[in-house]
């Protein structure tokens, strides 16, 4: 995962945590941050095709015209299981929508491929690594 992130211009340290980060609350407790600083990487089916939605951990997705992808389709689209899906570095590029509320933080924490792996990154660096992402209310 570290190499995949580096190819997107992110110089971050992937950390393995002893506790699961499967939920935003678990991740926030393990990382010592606010729940809102956790980036939920969610796969939605929009017009039948997978799309990545990056949502703040303290928010719900309410403005996406689509539905959450089943676990098997999320894994097929990203190469990762739900609970460990990173915001980028997937097996294939996906259209990405980023929750604009993430900008209220300087740094956020993201899953890094497994339920126990995370990395922290400046929000603006994450957005720079996703140049084609649409940033808006989700």
Model-derived regions: residue spans:
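Extended, low-hydrophobicity, polar/charged segments
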Residues: 1-138
